[in-house]
Design a protein with these regions (language model features):
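Acidic catalytic patch
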Residues: 64-85, 94
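Short active-site oxyanion
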Residues: 33-36, 62-64, 103-108
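A generic structural signal for short hydrophobic patches within well-formed alpha-helices
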Residues: 12-13, 43-46, 73, 117
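Short, well-structured N-terminal submotif of metal-dependent ribonuclease cores
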Residues: 1-38, 48-61
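A general structural signal for well-ordered alpha-helical segments in protein cores
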Residues: 22-23, 43, 53-56, 73-76, ...
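Acidic, metal-associated active-site segment
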Residues: 46, 89-108
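Acidic, PIN/NYN-like endoribonuclease modules and their adjacent C-terminal/linker elements
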Residues: 2-4, 101-130
Length: 130
């Protein structure tokens, strides 16, 4: 059964930094056939200062990076409107939530902001703290 593990910027940064917990989670997901993914906006948002560009390229080559298309932005905008949210903080979360809501189920999101992501994703998506 296809499933998806989505990483927000904190989860992706921890993967870049070889955090043992996140590495183990991603490896277990991959071994189980779970698709590990993030968004292009999340890749841009993740912490780059302490990470060698080659490490970033290597990590991103091993996970799915979803493009932020007009369709995705329309879905994200609808989520923001329906929850009366706005601004860049919520925009990036809404893009991740739009991808999560349309990804093969079951979907898990690894995030530093479980409250906002849970609100935007709804009950069909499992949210765990990074």
């Amino acid at each position: 059964m296809p499933s998806t593990l989505l990483l927000d910027s904190e989860g992706l940064s921890k993967l870049y930094l070889k955090d043992r917990t996140v590495l183990a989670l991603v490896q277990a997901a991959s071994e189980e056939g779970t698709r590990v993914a993030t968004t292009a906006m999340t890749a841009l948002e993740a912490d780059y200062e302490r990470i060698h560009p080659a490490r970033i390229r290597w990590v991103l080559s091993r996970i799915d990076v979803h493009d932020v298309t007009k369709s995705v932005t329309d879905q994200a905008a609808a989520l923001l409107r329906s929850h009366h949210l706005s601004g860049p903080k919520y925009a990036i979360d809404a893009v991740l939530a739009a991808i999560a809501r349309s990804a093969p189920r079951p979907v898990t999101v690894l995030t530093s902001d479980p409250e906002d992501i849970s609100l935007l994703c709804g009950p069909a998506v499992e949210v765990i703290k990074a």
